[in-house]
Amino acid sequence: MKEVPKEPKKLREGYTTGACATAATRAALLTLISGEVQDESTIYLPVGRFATFHLEECEYRTSSAVASIIKDAGDDPDATHGALIISEVSWCNGVDIIIDGGVGVGRVTKPGLPVPVGEAAINPVPRKMLKETAQQLLAEYNIQKGVKVVISVPEGEEMAKKTLNARLGILGGISILGTRGIVVPFSTAAYKASIVQAISVAKASNCEHVVITTGGRSEKYGMKQFPELPEEAFIQMGDFVGFTLKQCKKQGMKKVSLVGMMGKFSKVAQGVMMVHSKSAPIDFNFLAKAASESGASAELVEEIKGANTASQVGDLMTQSGHHQFFEKLCEYCCLSALKEVGDGIDVDTSLYTLKGDFLGQAVQHGN
Protein backbone atom coordinates (compact mmCIF):
# COMPACT_ATOMS: atom_id res chain seq x y z
CA MET A 1 0.00 0.00 0.00
CA LYS A 2 1.36 3.37 -1.04
CA GLU A 3 2.12 5.66 1.87
CA VAL A 4 0.33 8.99 1.71
CA PRO A 5 2.76 11.82 2.49
CA LYS A 6 1.86 13.89 5.50
CA GLU A 7 0.85 17.48 4.92
CA PRO A 8 3.38 19.89 6.39
CA LYS A 9 2.32 21.22 9.76
CA LYS A 10 0.94 24.75 9.59
CA LEU A 11 3.24 27.14 11.40
CA ARG A 12 1.71 28.90 14.39
CA GLU A 13 1.53 32.70 14.43
CA GLY A 14 2.64 34.69 17.45
CA TYR A 15 2.05 38.19 18.80
CA THR A 16 4.19 41.31 18.69
CA THR A 17 5.56 43.14 21.71
CA GLY A 18 3.16 45.95 20.80
CA ALA A 19 0.13 43.65 20.98
CA CYS A 20 1.30 42.19 24.31
CA ALA A 21 1.87 45.67 25.76
CA THR A 22 -1.59 46.78 24.63
CA ALA A 23 -3.35 43.74 26.10
CA ALA A 24 -1.47 44.17 29.40
CA THR A 25 -2.39 47.87 29.44
CA ARG A 26 -6.08 47.16 28.88
CA ALA A 27 -6.09 44.68 31.77
CA ALA A 28 -4.20 47.05 34.08
CA LEU A 29 -6.47 50.01 33.30
CA LEU A 30 -9.62 47.90 33.69
CA THR A 31 -8.30 46.73 37.07
CA LEU A 32 -7.54 50.33 38.09
CA ILE A 33 -11.05 51.45 37.09
CA SER A 34 -13.05 48.55 38.53
CA GLY A 35 -10.84 47.35 41.37
CA GLU A 36 -11.30 43.82 40.02
CA VAL A 37 -8.21 41.80 39.09
CA GLN A 38 -8.34 40.36 35.55
CA ASP A 39 -7.38 36.85 34.34
CA GLU A 40 -7.19 37.59 30.62
CA SER A 41 -7.35 40.49 28.20
CA THR A 42 -8.92 40.75 24.74
CA ILE A 43 -7.88 43.42 22.23
CA TYR A 44 -8.55 44.20 18.58
CA LEU A 45 -5.42 43.79 16.47
CA PRO A 46 -4.43 46.08 13.55
CA VAL A 47 -4.56 42.99 11.31
CA GLY A 48 -8.34 43.03 11.75
CA ARG A 49 -9.26 40.46 14.38
CA PHE A 50 -9.60 40.01 18.13
CA ALA A 51 -7.04 38.18 20.26
CA THR A 52 -7.25 37.06 23.88
CA PHE A 53 -4.13 37.00 26.05
CA HIS A 54 -3.58 35.09 29.28
CA LEU A 55 -2.21 37.34 32.02
CA GLU A 56 0.89 36.21 33.85
CA GLU A 57 0.14 38.66 36.65
CA CYS A 58 -2.49 41.27 37.47
CA GLU A 59 -2.38 43.36 40.64
CA TYR A 60 -4.37 46.30 42.03
CA ARG A 61 -2.30 48.78 44.03
CA THR A 62 -3.15 51.94 45.96
CA SER A 63 -2.78 54.38 43.06
CA SER A 64 -1.96 52.10 40.13
CA ALA A 65 -2.52 48.67 38.62
CA VAL A 66 -0.06 46.29 36.98
CA ALA A 67 -0.61 43.52 34.44
CA SER A 68 1.91 41.37 32.59
CA ILE A 69 1.97 38.99 29.63
CA ILE A 70 4.65 36.58 28.39
CA LYS A 71 5.27 37.23 24.71
CA ASP A 72 4.68 34.21 22.48
CA ALA A 73 6.26 34.67 19.04
CA GLY A 74 4.71 31.44 17.72
CA ASP A 75 6.78 29.12 15.54
CA ASP A 76 9.26 31.84 14.60
CA PRO A 77 10.85 32.65 17.96
CA ASP A 78 12.71 35.95 17.78
CA ALA A 79 14.99 37.75 20.23
CA THR A 80 12.02 38.79 22.39
CA HIS A 81 10.23 35.42 22.48
CA GLY A 82 9.35 34.64 26.10
CA ALA A 83 9.79 38.25 27.25
CA LEU A 84 7.69 39.36 30.20
CA ILE A 85 5.88 42.52 29.05
CA ILE A 86 4.62 44.59 32.00
CA SER A 87 2.23 47.54 31.93
CA GLU A 88 1.76 49.77 34.95
CA VAL A 89 -1.15 52.20 34.69
CA SER A 90 -1.80 55.10 37.07
CA TRP A 91 -3.95 58.24 37.19
CA CYS A 92 -2.29 61.58 36.46
CA ASN A 93 -3.29 65.24 36.33
CA GLY A 94 -5.19 66.53 33.32
CA VAL A 95 -6.87 64.36 30.70
CA ASP A 96 -3.87 63.30 28.60
CA ILE A 97 -2.74 59.72 28.08
CA ILE A 98 1.01 59.61 28.70
CA ILE A 99 2.96 56.63 27.36
CA ASP A 100 6.51 55.90 28.48
CA GLY A 101 9.00 53.08 28.78
CA GLY A 102 10.41 51.70 32.00
CA VAL A 103 13.12 49.14 32.74
CA GLY A 104 14.18 47.12 29.70
CA VAL A 105 12.52 49.34 27.09
CA GLY A 106 15.12 51.18 25.03
CA ARG A 107 15.38 54.92 24.62
CA VAL A 108 16.07 56.62 21.29
CA THR A 109 19.39 58.51 21.15
CA LYS A 110 19.87 59.01 17.39
CA PRO A 111 17.72 60.74 14.76
CA GLY A 112 16.27 58.88 11.78
CA LEU A 113 13.87 56.60 13.64
CA PRO A 114 10.05 56.91 13.69
CA VAL A 115 10.26 57.90 17.38
CA PRO A 116 11.89 61.25 18.39
CA VAL A 117 15.22 61.35 20.24
CA GLY A 118 14.72 61.07 23.99
CA GLU A 119 11.49 59.09 23.76
CA ALA A 120 10.99 55.46 24.76
CA ALA A 121 11.39 53.09 21.80
CA ILE A 122 7.68 52.38 21.48
CA ASN A 123 6.92 52.59 17.77
CA PRO A 124 4.01 54.59 16.28
CA VAL A 125 1.54 51.72 15.78
CA PRO A 126 1.95 50.29 19.32
CA ARG A 127 1.68 53.86 20.71
CA LYS A 128 -1.57 54.32 18.79
CA MET A 129 -2.87 50.95 20.04
CA LEU A 130 -2.02 51.84 23.65
CA LYS A 131 -3.61 55.28 23.43
CA GLU A 132 -6.79 54.11 21.68
CA THR A 133 -7.25 51.20 24.10
CA ALA A 134 -7.02 53.59 27.06
CA GLN A 135 -9.37 56.10 25.42
CA GLN A 136 -11.99 53.42 24.70
CA LEU A 137 -12.02 52.17 28.29
CA LEU A 138 -12.18 55.67 29.76
CA ALA A 139 -15.09 56.55 27.45
CA GLU A 140 -16.87 53.28 28.27
CA TYR A 141 -16.76 54.10 32.01
CA ASN A 142 -17.36 57.84 31.43
CA ILE A 143 -14.10 58.78 33.16
CA GLN A 144 -12.38 62.08 32.43
CA LYS A 145 -8.96 61.65 33.97
CA GLY A 146 -5.39 61.55 32.78
CA VAL A 147 -3.65 58.18 32.55
CA LYS A 148 0.04 57.31 32.60
CA VAL A 149 1.11 54.02 31.01
CA VAL A 150 4.63 52.68 31.62
CA ILE A 151 5.73 49.59 29.68
CA SER A 152 8.62 47.56 31.13
CA VAL A 153 10.48 44.42 30.09
CA PRO A 154 12.66 43.14 32.98
CA GLU A 155 15.01 41.16 30.70
CA GLY A 156 14.84 43.72 27.90
CA GLU A 157 18.37 45.09 28.25
CA GLU A 158 19.87 41.61 27.92
CA MET A 159 17.53 40.68 25.05
CA ALA A 160 18.47 43.87 23.19
CA LYS A 161 22.04 42.56 22.83
CA LYS A 162 20.67 40.08 20.28
CA THR A 163 19.13 42.89 18.21
CA LEU A 164 20.42 45.85 16.19
CA ASN A 165 19.08 48.36 18.72
CA ALA A 166 22.46 49.61 19.93
CA ARG A 167 23.58 50.18 16.33
CA LEU A 168 20.41 52.16 15.68
CA GLY A 169 20.95 54.26 18.79
CA ILE A 170 18.26 52.60 20.90
CA LEU A 171 19.89 52.10 24.29
CA GLY A 172 18.85 50.35 27.48
CA GLY A 173 16.50 47.72 26.14
CA ILE A 174 14.28 46.38 23.40
CA SER A 175 11.81 48.23 21.19
CA ILE A 176 8.04 47.79 21.43
CA LEU A 177 7.17 46.96 17.84
CA GLY A 178 4.54 45.64 15.46
CA THR A 179 2.39 47.10 12.71
CA ARG A 180 -0.10 44.22 12.47
CA GLY A 181 -0.10 42.81 15.99
CA ILE A 182 0.90 39.34 14.85
CA VAL A 183 4.22 37.65 14.11
CA VAL A 184 3.99 35.69 10.85
CA PRO A 185 6.43 32.75 10.97
CA PHE A 186 9.57 33.36 8.91
CA SER A 187 8.18 36.57 7.41
CA THR A 188 10.68 38.77 5.60
CA ALA A 189 8.78 41.95 6.46
CA ALA A 190 10.44 42.47 9.84
CA TYR A 191 13.95 42.06 8.44
CA LYS A 192 13.23 44.42 5.56
CA ALA A 193 11.85 46.97 8.03
CA SER A 194 15.09 46.78 10.03
CA ILE A 195 17.10 47.44 6.85
CA VAL A 196 15.02 50.53 6.04
CA GLN A 197 15.44 51.75 9.62
CA ALA A 198 19.21 51.21 9.55
CA ILE A 199 19.55 53.20 6.32
CA SER A 200 17.39 55.99 7.79
CA VAL A 201 19.66 56.19 10.84
CA ALA A 202 22.73 56.29 8.59
CA LYS A 203 21.17 59.11 6.56
CA ALA A 204 20.20 61.05 9.70
CA SER A 205 23.82 60.64 10.89
CA ASN A 206 24.97 62.41 7.69
CA CYS A 207 26.33 59.24 6.07
CA GLU A 208 26.42 59.38 2.27
CA HIS A 209 28.51 56.23 1.97
CA VAL A 210 27.20 52.97 3.43
CA VAL A 211 28.67 49.47 3.53
CA ILE A 212 26.14 46.69 3.03
CA THR A 213 27.05 43.15 4.02
CA THR A 214 25.41 39.74 4.05
CA GLY A 215 26.02 39.16 7.77
CA GLY A 216 28.12 39.70 10.87
CA ARG A 217 31.30 38.12 9.57
CA SER A 218 31.42 40.11 6.33
CA GLU A 219 30.47 43.25 8.29
CA LYS A 220 33.52 42.70 10.51
CA TYR A 221 35.73 42.53 7.39
CA GLY A 222 34.04 45.65 6.01
CA MET A 223 34.71 47.59 9.22
CA LYS A 224 38.41 46.78 8.92
CA GLN A 225 38.41 47.87 5.29
CA PHE A 226 36.57 51.14 5.95
CA PRO A 227 37.77 52.25 9.42
CA GLU A 228 37.00 55.89 8.62
CA LEU A 229 33.24 55.25 8.49
CA PRO A 230 31.02 55.49 11.60
CA GLU A 231 29.24 52.42 12.94
CA GLU A 232 25.91 53.68 11.53
CA ALA A 233 27.28 53.30 7.99
CA PHE A 234 27.40 49.49 8.23
CA ILE A 235 24.18 47.69 7.35
CA GLN A 236 23.52 43.96 7.34
CA MET A 237 21.29 43.24 4.34
CA GLY A 238 21.10 39.47 4.77
CA ASP A 239 19.85 37.98 1.50
CA PHE A 240 18.03 41.15 0.38
CA VAL A 241 20.61 42.65 -1.97
CA GLY A 242 18.22 44.25 -4.46
CA PHE A 243 15.87 45.58 -1.79
CA THR A 244 18.75 47.15 0.17
CA LEU A 245 20.31 48.73 -2.90
CA LYS A 246 16.98 50.29 -3.88
CA GLN A 247 16.49 51.65 -0.36
CA CYS A 248 19.99 53.17 -0.41
CA LYS A 249 19.18 54.90 -3.71
CA LYS A 250 15.74 55.99 -2.44
CA GLN A 251 17.21 57.54 0.71
CA GLY A 252 19.84 59.49 -1.22
CA MET A 253 23.06 57.57 -0.58
CA LYS A 254 25.89 58.63 -2.89
CA LYS A 255 28.03 55.50 -2.56
CA VAL A 256 27.36 51.89 -1.60
CA SER A 257 30.08 49.34 -0.85
CA LEU A 258 29.10 45.67 -1.01
CA VAL A 259 31.26 43.40 1.14
CA GLY A 260 30.81 39.64 1.11
CA MET A 261 32.05 36.21 0.19
CA MET A 262 32.10 33.95 -2.86
CA GLY A 263 28.90 31.99 -2.24
CA LYS A 264 26.36 34.81 -2.24
CA PHE A 265 28.32 37.31 -4.32
CA SER A 266 28.70 34.77 -7.14
CA LYS A 267 24.92 35.02 -7.41
CA VAL A 268 24.97 38.83 -7.28
CA ALA A 269 27.55 38.82 -10.09
CA GLN A 270 25.17 36.81 -12.28
CA GLY A 271 22.33 39.26 -11.54
CA VAL A 272 20.51 37.52 -8.67
CA MET A 273 19.29 40.10 -6.15
CA MET A 274 17.78 37.73 -3.56
CA VAL A 275 20.64 35.46 -2.56
CA HIS A 276 18.99 32.96 -0.21
CA SER A 277 20.34 29.43 -0.78
CA LYS A 278 16.96 28.36 -2.18
CA SER A 279 16.32 31.42 -4.34
CA ALA A 280 18.65 30.60 -7.23
CA PRO A 281 21.49 28.13 -7.85
CA ILE A 282 25.03 29.27 -8.54
CA ASP A 283 25.64 29.32 -12.28
CA PHE A 284 28.98 27.55 -12.68
CA ASN A 285 28.95 28.21 -16.43
CA PHE A 286 28.86 31.92 -15.60
CA LEU A 287 31.82 31.51 -13.21
CA ALA A 288 33.66 29.53 -15.91
CA LYS A 289 33.06 32.41 -18.35
CA ALA A 290 34.46 34.91 -15.82
CA ALA A 291 37.46 32.62 -15.30
CA SER A 292 38.07 32.42 -19.04
CA GLU A 293 37.90 36.22 -19.28
CA SER A 294 40.53 36.31 -16.52
CA GLY A 295 42.98 34.17 -18.48
CA ALA A 296 42.20 30.70 -17.09
CA SER A 297 43.18 27.72 -19.24
CA ALA A 298 40.55 25.67 -21.08
CA GLU A 299 41.25 22.79 -18.69
CA LEU A 300 40.68 24.99 -15.63
CA VAL A 301 37.51 26.43 -17.16
CA GLU A 302 36.12 22.90 -17.58
CA GLU A 303 37.04 22.08 -13.98
CA ILE A 304 35.10 25.13 -12.81
CA LYS A 305 32.02 24.04 -14.77
CA GLY A 306 32.05 20.81 -12.75
CA ALA A 307 32.65 22.43 -9.35
CA ASN A 308 30.30 21.86 -6.41
CA THR A 309 30.54 25.20 -4.60
CA ALA A 310 31.56 28.79 -5.28
CA SER A 311 34.20 28.49 -2.54
CA GLN A 312 35.74 25.60 -4.47
CA VAL A 313 35.94 27.83 -7.56
CA GLY A 314 37.61 30.51 -5.44
CA ASP A 315 40.19 28.01 -4.20
CA LEU A 316 40.91 26.83 -7.76
CA MET A 317 41.48 30.38 -8.99
CA THR A 318 43.64 31.29 -5.98
CA GLN A 319 45.80 28.18 -6.34
CA SER A 320 46.29 28.81 -10.06
CA GLY A 321 47.28 32.43 -9.44
CA HIS A 322 44.36 33.98 -11.34
CA HIS A 323 43.69 36.74 -8.83
CA GLN A 324 42.18 38.99 -11.50
CA PHE A 325 39.22 36.57 -11.55
CA PHE A 326 38.03 38.05 -8.25
CA GLU A 327 38.27 41.59 -9.60
CA LYS A 328 36.25 40.45 -12.62
CA LEU A 329 33.62 38.93 -10.33
CA CYS A 330 33.48 42.16 -8.29
CA GLU A 331 33.07 44.12 -11.52
CA TYR A 332 30.10 41.94 -12.47
CA CYS A 333 28.60 42.52 -9.00
CA CYS A 334 28.88 46.29 -9.45
CA LEU A 335 27.29 46.13 -12.90
CA SER A 336 24.43 43.99 -11.56
CA ALA A 337 23.88 46.48 -8.73
CA LEU A 338 23.76 49.47 -11.11
CA LYS A 339 21.40 47.58 -13.40
CA GLU A 340 19.12 47.07 -10.38
CA VAL A 341 19.04 50.70 -9.21
CA GLY A 342 19.99 52.75 -12.27
CA ASP A 343 22.44 55.62 -12.32
CA GLY A 344 23.06 58.27 -9.68
CA ILE A 345 24.98 56.14 -7.19
CA ASP A 346 28.53 54.75 -7.06
CA VAL A 347 28.98 51.07 -6.25
CA ASP A 348 32.06 49.14 -5.24
CA THR A 349 32.33 45.47 -4.32
CA SER A 350 34.91 43.66 -2.17
CA LEU A 351 35.29 39.90 -1.90
CA TYR A 352 36.71 38.01 1.08
CA THR A 353 37.32 34.39 2.02
CA LEU A 354 35.46 32.90 4.97
CA LYS A 355 38.59 33.49 7.07
CA GLY A 356 38.75 37.16 6.10
CA ASP A 357 41.47 37.10 3.44
CA PHE A 358 40.93 39.86 0.86
CA LEU A 359 40.35 38.49 -2.65
CA GLY A 360 39.58 41.49 -4.84
CA GLN A 361 37.69 44.73 -5.41
CA ALA A 362 36.09 46.70 -8.23
CA VAL A 363 34.34 50.07 -8.55
CA GLN A 364 31.67 51.31 -10.94
CA HIS A 365 30.52 54.93 -11.03
CA GLY A 366 26.88 55.72 -11.73
CA ASN A 367 26.40 58.67 -14.08
Swiss-Prot record:
It comes from the Bacteria. The keyword Ribonucleoprotein does not apply. Signal peptide: none annotated. One of its GO terms (biological process) is methylation. GO terms for molecular function: cobalt-precorrin-5B C1-methyltransferase activity. The keyword Methyltransferase applies. SUPFAM superfamilies: CbiD-like (SSF111342). Its EC number is 2.1.1.195. It catalyses: Co-precorrin-5B + S-adenosyl-L-methionine = Co-precorrin-6A + S-adenosyl-L-homocysteine. Keywords: Cobalamin biosynthesis, Methyltransferase, S-adenosyl-L-methionine, Transferase. Pathway: Cofactor biosynthesis; adenosylcobalamin biosynthesis; cob(II)yrinate a,c-diamide from sirohydrochlorin (anaerobic route): step 6/10. InterPro entries: CbiD, CbiD_sf. HAMAP family: CbiD (MF_00787). PANTHER family: COBALT-PRECORRIN-5B C(1)-METHYLTRANSFERASE (PTHR35863:SF1). Belongs to the CbiD family. This is Cobalt-precorrin-5B C(1)-methyltransferase.
